[in-house]
């Protein structure tokens, strides 16, 4: 597997300070400054501190940074770095998939991307890129690329192979791609280890491409590979990439959710939202703990854990929202499911729990607010637009980002109130990251910092 590493200007300073990176990162994380994985600390999608309410294409933008490719993965923030993944070039796709465009049209592609897209052998041109930018200024710090290698899965036109959001434990960054390739990088961008799950285990054949992101637990990187044929849950050693445990999950369990690790009353639990049911495992060993739920088609939302309950939406069409207490064993349907709300569930965006209320939006911009204690609907409000990004909350506000670049800022509470509608003329599928009072939005081709 070929690899490329391109340090940007200023990376020498980063390398010289590598010995103290862990301490600096820990200090920032303790102050609530990091957003180290999909949906931030604890995957809760909640930020602390004061956050901006209004911005536009010309106001409130701290910086913009062009990306080295396209993708729908969300940014993460580790110390003074904002890290994001992208795809350069086009991948051959299996029958039944749809080829995503690199951006809205060829005019928006850089000369390099256009040349790659026109290459006679697109598989040779395909690159997966991990980039780091200075959190305060947007200056590029480093870029690492690896060659994309098949087998290549089916894809939906809304995304490409750079869909999983990277994760970090404060020492390394783990970037996963839709072929099954995963790379671990130091915070200086230097490669530590790589694996290709699509060739080592089985080709990735999740319907519409792979969307699940890595979850970090202690010294493990946990990966959900729910596919139409061989589905499995895998834990790799964070330092070496070696397999620590693997659980086969059968066939036909297609899902795109990201596993969530929580502290339950009887020990830590690893939660998985899949088409067959909801499962909890011991994250240290992969042992099954409990399960519940009936079959649903292709769940995408990830679970959230707040106030002693697990909340999640089950996915495609006429689905429901559940509140589950952890700590059970075996089938917990009759013992630990506190409530089920039959409508208002989101298909793609995940739920955010904020100050006792659940907020969710469907793909057509209808926001539903539910009482987290009872499951009773508090209100519904139509924003309009198309939504794939998951909402985030903080500073008494809830943020919803539409595909067409509108961010609706709602006042958190029992009455719907839109505080602002902020427009950026770009396409957004990725969910926001928040750190140090800044909101980071990733479009098709740009990383934007709002402050």
Whereabouts are the PLM-identified features?
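N-terminal secretory signal peptides that target proteins for export/translocation
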Residues: 1-12
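Short intrinsically disordered, low-complexity coil segments enriched in acidic
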Residues: 2-3, 17, 84, 188
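General helical structural elements
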Residues: 7, 16-17, 43, 446
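Hydrophobic alpha-helical segments, especially transmembrane helices
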Residues: 13-14, 40
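Bacterial N-terminal signal peptides
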Residues: 15-26
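Noncatalytic, solvent-exposed loop/strand surfaces
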Residues: 28-451
């Amino acid at each position: 597997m070929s690899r490329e590493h391109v340090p940007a200007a200023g990376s020498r300073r980063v390398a010289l300070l590598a010995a103290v990176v862990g301490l600096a990162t820990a200090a920032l994380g303790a102050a609530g400054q990091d957003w180290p994985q999909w949906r931030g600390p604890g995957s809760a999608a909640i930020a602390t501190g004061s956050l901006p309410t209004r911005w536009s294409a010309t106001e409130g933008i701290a910086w913009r940074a062009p990306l080295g490719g396209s993708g729908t993965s969300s940014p993460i923030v580790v110390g003074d770095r904002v890290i994001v993944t992208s795809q350069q070039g086009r991948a051959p796709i299996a029958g039944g998939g749809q080829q995503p465009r690199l951006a809205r049209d060829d005019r928006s592609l850089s000369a390099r991307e256009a040349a790659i897209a026109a290459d006679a052998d697109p598989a040779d041109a395909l690159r997966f890129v991990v980039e780091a930018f200075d959190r305060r200024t947007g200056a590029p710090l480093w870029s690492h690329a690896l060659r994309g290698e098949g087998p290549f899965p089916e894809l939906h036109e809304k995304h490409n192979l750079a869909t999983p959001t990277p994760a970090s434990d404060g020492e390394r960054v783990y970037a996963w791609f839709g072929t099954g390739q995963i790379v671990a990088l130091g915070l200086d961008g230097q490669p530590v280890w790589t694996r290709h799950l699509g060739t080592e285990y089985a080709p990735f054949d999740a319907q519409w491409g792979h969307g699940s992101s890595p979850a970090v637990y202690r010294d493990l990187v946990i990966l959900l590979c729910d596919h139409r044929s061989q589905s499995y849950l895998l834990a790799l050693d964070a330092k070496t990439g070696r397999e620590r445990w693997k659980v086969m999950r059968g066939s036909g369990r297609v899902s795109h959710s990201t596993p969530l690790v929580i502290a339950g009353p009887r020990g830590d639990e690893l939660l998985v939202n899949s088409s067959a049911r909801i499962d909890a495992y011991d994250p240290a060993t992969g042992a099954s703990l409990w399960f519940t739920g009936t079959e649903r088609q292709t769940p995408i939302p990830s679970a959230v854990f707040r106030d002693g309950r697990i909340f999640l939406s089950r996915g495609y069409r006429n689905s429901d929202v559940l509140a589950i207490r952890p700590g059970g064993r075996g089938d917990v349907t009759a013992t630990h499911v506190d409530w089920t709300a039959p409508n208002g569930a989101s298909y793609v965006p995940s739920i955010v729990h904020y100050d006792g209320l659940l907020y969710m939006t469907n793909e057509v911009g209808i926001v539903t607010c539910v009482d987290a204690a009872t499951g009773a609907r508090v209100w519904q409000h139509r924003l309009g637009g198309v939504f794939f990004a998951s909402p985030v909350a903080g500073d008494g506000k809830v943020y919803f980002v539409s595909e067409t670049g509108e961010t609706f800022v709602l006042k958190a509470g029992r009455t719907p109130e839109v505080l602002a509608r902020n427009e950026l003329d770009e396409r957004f599928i990725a969910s926001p990251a928040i750190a140090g009072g800044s909101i980071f939005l990733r479009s098709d081709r740009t990383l934007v910092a709002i402050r």
